[in-house]
């Protein structure tokens, strides 16, 4: 099984992935981790797509955490797609925490430009960070996994 957890930065994707990793004994890939699979990017993309396709058809569980829209094209059709979003102010607050407490204006402008970039993507489950607990989010994904 392949579980794609996608959304903007600082929405809770990694927290969810870590919770699911424990529950499902899954392998987690984040962003461009797949580049380690081969020497060239094209070969790495191809190898990663093959890995995902094999996992989608087999017993192994792979979780792919995506924060760049162009990485969605790597996903196999039959994967579980989980969109994680958060209000812009929450994203900015979390990003500021990661950068020492202050959010530079250019970073805020970048976050504002990118906000909503995943909103129209098809998904099996849409989680809004802060509306439910991380434990409830994990339970919702696990329930979908049992249904697949």
Question: Which role does the model predict for each range below?
Answer:
Residues 2:
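Walker A (P-loop) ATP-phosphate-binding motif of ABC ATPase nucleotide-binding domains
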Residues 5:
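Hydrophobic anchor at the beta1->P-loop junction of P-loop NTPases
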Residues 9:
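The conserved Walker
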Residues 12:
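Conserved glycine(s) of the Walker
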Residues 15-57:
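Conserved substrate/cofactor phosphate-moiety recognition/catalytic segment
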Residues 57-63:
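Loop/turn-to-beta-strand initiation segments
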Residues 77-96:
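Conserved phosphate-donor/acceptor-positioning beta-strand/loop module used by diverse small-molecule
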Residues 100-148:
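Small-molecule kinase domains that catalyze NTP-dependent phosphoryl transfer to phosphate-bearing small molecules
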């Amino acid at each position: 099984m392949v579980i794609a957890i996608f959304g903007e930065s600082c929405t809770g994707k990694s927290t969810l992935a870590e919770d699911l990793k424990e529950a499902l004994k899954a392998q987690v890939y984040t962003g461009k981790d797949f580049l380690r699979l081969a020497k060239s990017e094209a070969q790495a993309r191809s190898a990663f797509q093959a890995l995902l396709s094999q996992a989608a058809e087999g017993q192994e569980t792979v979780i792919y955490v995506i924060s760049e829209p162009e990485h969605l094209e790597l996903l196999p059709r039959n994967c579980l797609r989980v969109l994680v979003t958060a209000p812009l102010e929450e994203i900015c607050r979390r990003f500021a925490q990661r950068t020492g407490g202050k959010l530079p204006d250019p970073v805020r402008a970048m976050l504002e430009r990118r906000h909503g970039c995943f909103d129209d993507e098809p998904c099996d489950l849409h989680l809004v960070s802060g509306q439910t607990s991380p434990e409830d989010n994990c339970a919702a994904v696990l329930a979908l996994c049992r249904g697949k």
